[in-house]
Amino acid sequence: MNYDYLTDEQKQQLYFHQMQAEQQQHQQQLHYKQQQHIQQQQQHQQNQQNQQQQPQPPRQPFSTFLQNNGSNSDLPQMGTFQQDLQRQNIPNLRFSQQNQPSDLGQEFQDDDSFMDEDLTEIHEQPPMQELNSSPMTHPHSFQQNFQTPTKNDDANLRNQQFQSVDSERSLDFKPPVTFTKLNNNSNADLSSPTESSFLKSNLNLPNSNIPPAGASNDPNAQKSNYIYFNRQPNSLNKIAQDKASSIKLKLENYYQMSVAHAIERNQRRLDLEHKLLNEESGSSEERKNRQLQNLGKKESQFLRLRRTKLSLEDFNTVKVIGKGAFGEVRLVQKRDTGKIYAMKTLLKSEMYKKDQLAHVKAERDVLAGSDSPWVVSLYYSFQDAQYLYLIMEFLPGGDLMTMLIRWQIFTEDITRFYMAECVLAIEAIHKLGFIHRDIKPDNILIDIRGHIKLSDFGLSTGFHKTHDSNYYKKLLEKENPHHTNPQNGNLQAPSMATNNRNSMMVDAIHLTMSNRQQMQTWRKSRRLMAYSTVGTPDYIAPEIFVHQGYGQECDWWSLGAIMFECLIGWPPFCSETPHETYRKILNWQETLQIPDDIHLSPESEDLIRKLLTNAENRLGRYNGADELKSHPFFRGVDWDTIRKVDAPFIPKLRSITDTRFFPTDELENVPDSPALSKAMEQRDQVLQNGGNVKEDLPFIGYTYSRFDYLTRKNAL
């Protein structure tokens, strides 16, 4: 019977009925076995009573037996006969003599012919000599001999005296100290210095803190028979500690990934079954079964392809389309398939120095956990000794900053379109449980159809332990203590500048709100800031600067700042220096002003002011994106089909590698980072020497492969 199309309630009822039937069947079998056992016991007792009632014939001495059989042997020859029996390897002869029932032993205590009777039985049935005969040839004889040991045997065991099979002499056997049982029933005095040192040397327990004899003040206190010791991994060398930490993290990551993959696999199966149940009744059973079989083939294919290891040698670099302080973004083409990707490379050493370990892990988790059309798709991630690599989809339309530089100001209709799509994109990030914290025009990319997608989640957080910098500081305390102490100069202390990735200053621009030409110069300088770690604090919420508690509402502040720039032409808190920008953002009540020569609709101005306000009163704090969707500024927006409509700007490409919407010409004026050049030289040396790629502790588990992309035809 096919149970795939039953409801969960029907499956549960069917499962309960089956369990009840199995329990009833088990009880019947148990009752039958009990009745059979009782009958066997009654039959056995009846047989014993019948044997006791039958009269036993009188026993004859062995000498009479020999005379009746016409034998001339006499009793002194029995010593030789006994030696012959021993040479015939009769097993457990002496033990069988001791293993007689106690009542028979009492009957023949005063009868000298008891030994003769035993030998009579042996003489009547002499043993047959067999090749390779041994006591283990017939194990059932051992079972019969050892099933009912006598009291004498117990006494012998307590005295630790064992009889030899091949000789008549006994051996006094005492177990050595290493056989002493370390449990509650042990009589070993572990407080003894001799036994303590012996156990420590044999059990390899360094620095055991066994309490010495007489250490307790209470004379009536019972001595402990346990070994107490402290783990001291610091006594091991540095290499051993690093290997232990690496193995521990790899094991944790292995089981975490195994459980996560199993949950995802089961969820994909449930989603497909739910989809098939909701289809029209016209779908045939054969078609549904075929789809389930196809899913099984995809799962099997994914397990194989996921083990395929990628490296930098699998891609050809077409052009560098972005640079930053921690790496660069390249347009690459896969050698075997010819497909185009955007490869983001991050330098590991800079991740250490700039305290970006938590940020890069959060970015990878966001991209890997999202299948939303509003987020850039991550296909693969891998690493080598110097770099982390993110293989993402290539969006040829550039970013929103390029559009602002080209068009300067958007109309309200165009602004409404892009802001509505940004609302849906931010909502998708929040549903994943993440906060972006760095939404700006540079991170809003344009796809081939003109719609937006969010990227660059380097400052995002999901409030997981691996997204917290303190987690990596504790992890690296023993590996590189000088990397984790902000006071020694090797790692910059967290500050506004480092948190916003500021490292290269540009010329200050004396800004006047009426000078559009100078504003355009600021935009070009702003692009240079985007390539470096100078960053732009213009879009960051004030609660992030003051290290107060904040939530998802900080992303809505950034959206308000972007909307201000689209309608007016510059950010709301634009200043000559970043520090002046910080000051204006913190004092937003006084510095937020809309120029008099800019005419905005009441709806747009109201939305800007409700987004650029304190966190308690900010729009979207309590009900998220629904509060923004219901604002009058977005009246008429079809939120369900907005991605299907034509965008205001659709990039027209000349080829699949066309990058004219990226300011690649400006990248020639951006100097390469010395750290990047040094890392590339080190990587080339490692490859020439044939060195193995080594995973660092913070980057264990960084590798990723996407299911829906990897299971496509010719994905790899």
Curated annotation (Swiss-Prot):
ATP binds at I321, G322, K323, G324, A325, F326, G327, E328, V329, K344. Residues 22-78, 128-154, 176-223 are annotated as: Disordered. SUPFAM superfamilies: Protein kinase-like (PK-like). GO terms for biological process: budding cell apical bud growth; establishment or maintenance of actin cytoskeleton polarity; filamentous growth; regulation of fungal-type cell wall organization; regulation of protein secretion; septum digestion after cytokinesis. SMART domains: S_TK_X, S_TKc. Residues 62-78, 130-150, 180-195 have a biased composition (Polar residues). It is an enzyme of class 2 (transferase). It comes from the Eukaryota. Its EC number is 2.7.11.1. Gene3D superfamilies: Phosphorylase Kinase, domain 1 (3.30.200.20), Transferase(Phosphotransferase) domain 1 (1.10.510.10). GO terms for cellular component: cell cortex; cellular bud neck; cellular bud tip; incipient cellular bud site; mating projection tip; nucleus; serine/threonine protein kinase complex. GO terms for molecular function: ATP binding; identical protein binding; protein serine kinase activity; protein serine/threonine kinase activity. It holds the Pfam family Pkinase. Residues 315-634 form the Protein kinase domain. Residues 635-714 form the AGC-kinase C-terminal domain. It catalyses: L-seryl-[protein] + ATP = O-phospho-L-seryl-[protein] + ADP + H(+); L-threonyl-[protein] + ATP = O-phospho-L-threonyl-[protein] + ADP + H(+). Residues 22-54, 196-212 have a biased composition (Low complexity). Keywords: ATP-binding, Kinase, Nucleotide-binding, Phosphoprotein, Serine/threonine-protein kinase, Transferase. The active site is at D438 (proton acceptor). Protein kinase that seems to play a role in the regulation of cell morphogenesis and proliferation. Belongs to the protein kinase superfamily. STE Ser/Thr protein kinase family. COT1 subfamily. This is Serine/threonine-protein kinase CBK1. It comes from Debaryomyces hansenii (strain ATCC 36239 / CBS 767 / BCRC 21394 / JCM 1990 / NBRC 0083 / IGC 2968).
